[in-house]
Amino acid sequence: MSVKIVIKPNTYFDSVSLMSISTRANKLDGVEQAFVAMATEMNKGVLKNLGLLTPELEQAKNGDLMIVINGKSGADNEQLLVEIEELFNTKAQSGSHEARYATIGSAKKHIPESNLAVISVNGLFAAREARQALQNDLNVMLFSDNVSVEDELALKQLAHEKGLLMMGPDCGTAIINGAALCFGNAVRRGNIGIVGASGTGSQELSVRIHEFGGGVSQLIGTGGRDLSEKIGGLMMLDAIGMLENDPQTEIIALISKPPAPAVARKVLERARACRKPVVVCFLDRGETPVDEQGLQFARGTKEAALKAVMLSGVKQENLDLHTLNQPLIADVRARLQPQQKYIRGLFCGGTLCDETMFAVMEKHGDVYSNIQPDPEFRLKDINRSIKHTFLDFGDDDFTNGKPHPMIDPTNRISRLIEEARDPEVAVIVMDFVLGFGSHEDPVGSTIETIKEAKAIAAAEGRELIILAYVLGTDLDTPSLEQQSQMLLDAGVILASSSTNTGLLAREFICKGEEA
């Protein structure tokens, strides 16, 4: 094995840039494996697991950049290094910035009218940069993760005192005055404001609102821990107030994974007091509360979008609600062999994984996952599926030192082949997320592997059902229609929404009396 190691002292690049560069580096001819990352302890741990950690790399400091190249046999590592370093130059030249500043303070001084900072830095420095932005009267979207709960609480308290947004940490989705930040979809402007403690959940809600003829005024992300007991929903509470006073917003929709009970009560109390109608979608398996005056509840993202657009004036009778295709369900059941009884979910989006998993759990037992709220059914080994298994490839379990699957789907692609070889698997469920920040061709990057997976099953005399959901709109690039057609041409069954994905998957595998 021929390995080239370069350490660039005090050379910082944000995680989003490094994810993109690392993905492109691994596609270069002659590269067996390339690792481009900051020298954090977490990233060193990844190198150790790969057998690439050397004493030299071990001594590198957090602010140092590591480039590790494992070239294929006969490859020239020096030339590969030149090509990888050129990727940094391309990244710098393609940026839309007009100037560079050493600090947030100096940027604010030169652009005094600016009011928002998007921060993606090493988690060790993220709180410091976010605090500096808030002190300069800037709203903050903090993409960085690995920020302590204590720092998050302090930042959100400071933002609250100053009347500013503190979106994050680990906030990946927002739409502010029509501009999508980090991950987001091209949706029409409208009068529905979204507050989301869930990235892909917020994207899904915005996309369904768009499909149903509504539009989005603002989408404010809070970060996934906002509704925890320690944070207390500070950002969601403040965001409700901001949207209540936003002249562009007439309806407010809230979405989150299950919040802490005390925080849920606090948020609902604030929602009841809001002068504008509020739709609440807290994804879980519990009973959906009864609607109240000015406050409506939704069991899933599709229902939340429907209620929001109806409040905005859209008539339900004019909508295609995509009811389940019963003839299709019967046909799929007939095509499965008796031993095929399990669902395997391979997801990029955490909320999409949750919503599908919860739907299956309503009808079937033995549902395992790396994000299962029930410890009894949380996977002990994420590399081995058990019975019904749902994997969130965007969780830290899989992204530790690696790009998010919405940017680089490599991890999920290899797992697809592994699951296809299991004769007890009936259905594999996959999501494909379009939009700003995502892979430029998510379906195209996976389609050949999908064909290979189906061929593996066919060679053993069984049919592997692949059920896919494409999260996107007609305005996204690539388009929803183009990506969907590629899947249909490969014999993949398409679901029309995240909600319908779970409902279809659970029905496909029903046998005997269950059916």
Swiss-Prot record:
Transmembrane spans: none
GO cellular component, as recorded: cytosol; succinate-CoA ligase complex (ADP-forming)
GO molecular function list: succinate-CoA ligase (ADP-forming) activity; succinate-CoA ligase (GDP-forming) activity
BP GO annotations: tricarboxylic acid cycle
InterPro entries hit by this protein: CoA-bd (IPR003781), SUCC_ACL_C (IPR005811), Succinyl-CoA_synth-like (IPR016102)
Pfam families attached to this UniProt entry: CoA_binding, Ligase_CoA
Family statement: Belongs to the AllF family.
Name of this chain's protein: Uncharacterized protein YahF
Organism the protein comes from: Escherichia coli (strain K12)
